[in-house]
From Swiss-Prot:
This is 4-hydroxy-tetrahydrodipicolinate reductase. It catalyses: (S)-2,3,4,5-tetrahydrodipicolinate + NAD(+) + H2O = (2S,4S)-4-hydroxy-2,3,4,5-tetrahydrodipicolinate + NADH + H(+); (S)-2,3,4,5-tetrahydrodipicolinate + NADP(+) + H2O = (2S,4S)-4-hydroxy-2,3,4,5-tetrahydrodipicolinate + NADPH + H(+). NAD(+) binds at residues 9-14, 35, 92-94, 116-119. NADP(+) binds at residue 36. The active site is at residues 149, 153. Its EC number is 1.17.1.8. It comes from Nitratidesulfovibrio vulgaris (strain ATCC 29579 / DSM 644 / CCUG 34227 / NCIMB 8303 / VKM B-1760 / Hildenborough) (Desulfovibrio vulgaris).
Length: 259
């Protein structure tokens, strides 16, 4: 039996990509699409429910898995509505503050809830191998990162960059807020050894590029992940949705739980 999928923001770039790919997966079916009231009629598709109110649509798809790549406040509203109606949720939105992350963790005790700032296979493999690389190199190597995205991205640094920076900090038993440097200007003196630089570039239509630099005496290692298409993230979300449908509530799941 196929898993019914509910797509939030179905008229957006990610939402429309997800809708298209769901229809190509035999184990999934597109059950409902949601958009803002002024755009809801434009996302209607044959054989699935279209609307704008989660409290109206979600109860019509019992057992449905919601996929949301919208914006922090909208995704929080989605998660709360899912908790009211018992639906599972896959969230790929970035830019959550600490209070919102804590609320997601609390909601995950009631419903099946999955959140990952980046759902590409490559990035999540990178998160697995980076700690070992950092440990092997030792603390004489400075750690820096540059992330590049399209000019319409609203949050900075990207959620992926922050997760990669957390990964680097954890490998050295550092607390990221204590060592992160997001801006350098003027006479700032020598670079502290206990620091992780995270720099941001915005422009054009770049889907996403993240480069981690390990800079040591006489050499450097650069590790780069480039996303060439939003399908990378959409495919990861579909994989997460199919997996989440078989899980139970109790924790805030992420890509590490799948790999």
């Amino acid at each position: 039996m196929s898993t019914p999928i509910i797509v939030m923001g179905a008229g957006g770039r990610m939402g429309s990509t997800i809708c298209r790919l769901v229809q190509e997966e035999p184990q999934l079916c597109l059950a409902a699409v949601l958009e803002r009231p002024d755009r809801a009629s434009g996302v209607a598709r044959d054989g699935c429910i279209a609307g704008s109110d989660p409290d109206v649509v979600f109860p019509q798809v019992p057992g449905g898995v919601i996929i949301d790549f919208t914006a922090p406040e909208a995704s929080m509203a989605t998660a709360r509505a899912a908790a009211r109606h018992g639906n599972a949720v896959v969230i790929g939105t970035t830019g959550f503050n600490e209070e919102q992350k804590a609320e997601l963790a609390e909601l995950a005790r009631q419903i099946r809830l999955f959140w990952a700032p980046n759902m590409s296979v490559g990035v999540n493999v990178l998160l697995k191998v980076l700690p070992e690389l950092v440990r092997l190199l030792g603390e004489k190597y400075d750690l820096e990162m540059v992330e590049l995205h399209h000019n319409r991205k609203k949050d900075s640094p990207s959620g992926t960059a922050l997760r990669l920076a957390e990964c680097l900090a954890e490998a050295r038993d550092w607390n990221l807020p204590d060592v992160a440097c997001y801006h350098r200007e003027g006479i700032i003196g020598e670079r502290p050894q206990k620091e992780i630089g995270v720099q941001t570039i915005r422009g054009g239509d770049v889907v996403g590029v993240h480069t981690v630099y390990c800079l040591g005496p006489g050499e450097r290692i650069e590790v780069t992940h480039q996303a060439h298409s939003r399908e990378t993230f959409a495919q990861g979300a579909l994989r997460a949705a199919a997996w989440l449908a078989t899980q139970k509530p109790g924790k805030l799941y992420n890509m590490a739980d799948i790999f």
